[in-house]
Amino acid sequence: MSDNVLLHLGEEPRFDQIKTEDIKPALQTAIAEAREQIAAIKAQTHTDWANTVEKLTDITERVGRIWSVVSHLNSVVDTPELRAVYNELMPEITIFFTEIGQDIELYNRFKIIKNSAEFDTLSPAQQTKLNHDLRDFVLSGAELPPEQQAELAQLQTEGAQLGAKFAQNIQDATDAFGIYFDDAAPLAGIPEDSIAMFAAAAQSEGKTGYKIGLQIPHYLAVIQYADNRELREQIYRAYVTRASELADEGKFDNTANVEQTLANALKTAKLLGFKNYAELSLATKMADTPEQVLNFLHDLARRAKPFAEKDFAEIKAFARESLNIEDPQSWDLSYAAEKLRQAKYAFSETEVKKYFPISKVLAGLFAQIKKLYGIELAEKTVPVWHKDVRYFELKQDGQTIGGVYMDLYAREGKRGGAWMDGYKSRRRFADGTLQLPTAYLVCNFTPPVGDKEARLSHDEIITLFHETGHGLHHLLTQVDEVGVSGINGVEWDAVELPSQFMENFVWEYDVLAQMSSHEETGAVLPKELFDKMHAAKNFQRGMFLVRQMEFALFDMEIYHQEDEGRLKEWPQILDKVRQEVAVTQPPAYNRFALSFSHIFAGGYAAGYYSYAWAEVLSADAYAAFEESDDVAETGRRFWKEVLAVGGSRSAAESFKAFRGREPSLDALLRHSGFDNAA
């Protein structure tokens, strides 16, 4: 067991030496040792910060880090063997952390510290962590009688398993699909680099011709560019019926998972004394009540809908007059929008993409980080889980302050979407030594083909900056308590502030120019082309925003239900939301909710509104840079008041410290082109 690398992870895990067969013994050994150490804490006659809170942090961090690596690998290099052990261990890890959260002896010891003279001697970050811990004990059921604790533990274990199964069904359904073409004739209109990607996908299976899958670069290439309407409809139908009863003979159908997840969430909330799961979700967020969130979303939807109606009318007219599509359907909208954008603003996304090789984009991203915060990134060779992964150290005045893994390209066996997660968090130990934070930054960009460098679309650059914003939030923390350093302890509806804030810089010409180099001439992005892009920034913005309101309202409404008998009515709730906010209705076979992993497998249950909520904060925060002539000084202030403090104080306090006032909706409305909306 001593040679099991998962028991000795260190600063950077030896990913090249991790064996699937080592996972189970490592985790079970770590959990067994942890339980012995927790028993020792409870056997002590004296209780203080060092021998209780600090010691428990040591214990949980070790187990949590092992599971973090396993969970990460399950997301990025899924294999049948890895998935089997992951699913087998999911209940064990859930039970372990549930036991801690429900341990009345530990809870009482934490209360002793809160009520002791020592509490006043703790740092503000330590006090915040202790208060969060006490809250989390209550939300884990520490105050419940034993029989209800057991019921809650069972619900939490089942909930974790349901989320994992939901995500795995989506991945399996995505990877199971493929259509093949012998020649490129049916692919007319699709950009050359995407056609090369289809050819590479076929070659990877030992086939000639072209393979189109449902990974997001494949889907977008067809739905946005393919002149072949039948192909667009075929790919659209396959994409929106993933993980449903309408695809793969129902083998990956998530319908039961959705209904069981909703029932599980409601039972959990009621056991803890809440009327519904939305109330429980908001217990750890900035927003106070579900009604406050619903009012916020309805207000934004009301403001956006007139613009969405105008957007849709413009697309319908253009499709009819210029594309000979009399009645545009869901699979026509992205295609027609791209053609309209080209006609209206005289540029295409394909043209833009030619300017952004990944090497220049990363160099430009790093230059912007240095400009804002004085931080440099330097590549370092470390063990990784896939040949495409790169690792960078963050340096301040030559000193390493953190590190980030970047896994940027789509591939089979990798979960879709983009995300940032932490491997470890900043922490100062009792002896004064400092543990540095490390993050994973994962995207699903169009991969390079052959010896050609990958090139990013402007949307992909926005995604990269977004996830980097999350990463910087985790890595630039200056808090020494692991429970509130970086993104830890930050309210979920504020966690998107740093990520959405970073997106704004991708709309500055100087930023884009320094990361551009045309694939043929090496020329930088022309100002004329940028001006066209900027003019088109809010193109179809109304349609986009009402779609986001549809997602967020659906999420909040289904988790706001108090009657278990009505939980199966979620399709009707979605229809009702669409009737209120949407300007176009999808076909009856659309099963979007069955792949809505954010709210059924990704931690955003009764929390998807966070994107819009945090966009108010991020637009207002960026406005400080628009108002300032000194970007570096404003960047240092944003670092100090928002990024550095992590979860050690409330997000509302951090925002007010940066802006000097409460957040305002004005900047978001202005950036969205809605500032003249009533």
Name these PLM-found stretches:
Residues M1-D22, T29, A188-G189, M197, ...:
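C-terminal, non-catalytic "cap/extension" segments appended to globular domains
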Residues M1-I190, F625:
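N-terminal helix-rich structural modules
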Residues E61-H72, R135, R237, L333-R341, ...:
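Short, hydrophobic/amphipathic alpha-helical patches that form generic packing surfaces
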Residues K42-V53, V76-P80, D248-K251, L280, ...:
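Short, surface-exposed loop/turn segments at secondary-structure junctions
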Residues K129, Q161, Q168, A173-G213, ...:
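Active-site-proximal, well-structured secondary-structure segments within enzyme catalytic domains
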Residues T446-F465:
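Short pre-active-site segment immediately N-terminal to the catalytic Zn-binding motif
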Residues L7-D22, V70-L89, I112-Q154, G213-A256, ...:
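Short His/Asp/Glu-rich catalytic/ion-coordination signatures at enzyme active sites or charged loops
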